[in-house]
Amino acid sequence: ACRCKKGERMPLTIAGSDPRKKGTITLVVQEVGLSSTRLCELNEGDYITDVVGPLGQATHIEKFGTVVCAGGGVGVAPMLPIVQALKAAGNRVITVLAGRNKDLIILEKEMRESSDEVIIMTDDGSYGRKGLVTEGVEEVIKREKVDKMLRYRSCHHDEVRLLAD
């Protein structure tokens, strides 16, 4: 989480870090309100008043076999280091990325570099296949054995419920 000067505290997801560059992290921010807009206006070397984290639980990584990682929107950001770690552990990684349209598909290049297969789904069909993230996941489950399934949001509420079923 970070606090921009005269802005609210907002949770942010670390999409990567570089241990060779002390203190360097990669954040993904969707510009939707005052604080996120101010954050997006910062330049390299600018100051952020307060940064707290990382927060939460680390994802357990081991060699599972075939792993499907599915997410949409900014929910894809926390998936990236996990996909990279799963691949490094020797898994076959299939990534399903989703967004409302082509412009909202993020980190595709980076996901392709660490995945055996990437399936793109867009609500409007402007890129990849038209449909929800769940349809991409169902395609994989129908054709092959999946040993582990990981899902990340933000995606539609109904998609999260379907992925949980």
Where are the model-predicted features located?
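Ferredoxin-reductase
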Residues: 1-46
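FNR/FR-type flavoprotein reductase catalytic core
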Residues: 34-165
